[in-house]
């Protein structure tokens, strides 16, 4: 809100909680200068802020670069204080919600199987189960992949056959689940990364290779749930779907 441009530039407020905690009590350059780095660091430490001394030092340094009080500073300071409190409350609400989702997910008997697949954590796993239910709506892994927009659909006509295209209508949330899980798994050594690198070597760009990996992992997860077995880097002998 323009109270202290140097203080705004001193931190990435979207990436660290400490500077937001700071703004619940100290919003103006004058208030920060009066507090001083030592007192400010102690205040932050009592509120379990990480690297409290560094946050305090950077804040006071920014405050010392501005000696002028800007018009409307008091009103703007109150607004900053209110917004900081709201952001911290929202952060706590998100943490509580995540915890509830994780707890609910782990009550499902399939949770251990799903979570054993690299990249498929409790949040993505919970979203997957919320969408697919008991999987009774899918005849096989191919149908699940098609629902996620990861398998081509036939557009054969009376004149042409073998005409397959990417589906225009698919469930974007389930596609997101498989895409994000594949992206996470691809970053770690293992079969997912090996498959991704293989597809890149074949000439696919990053997104195409990642979607190919996501499609492959649909088959893997389907087989795991069907057989009620945990993921293993070396697949077991195949059996009919």
What are these regions (language model features)?
Residues 1-241:
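A detector of single, family-specific signature residues
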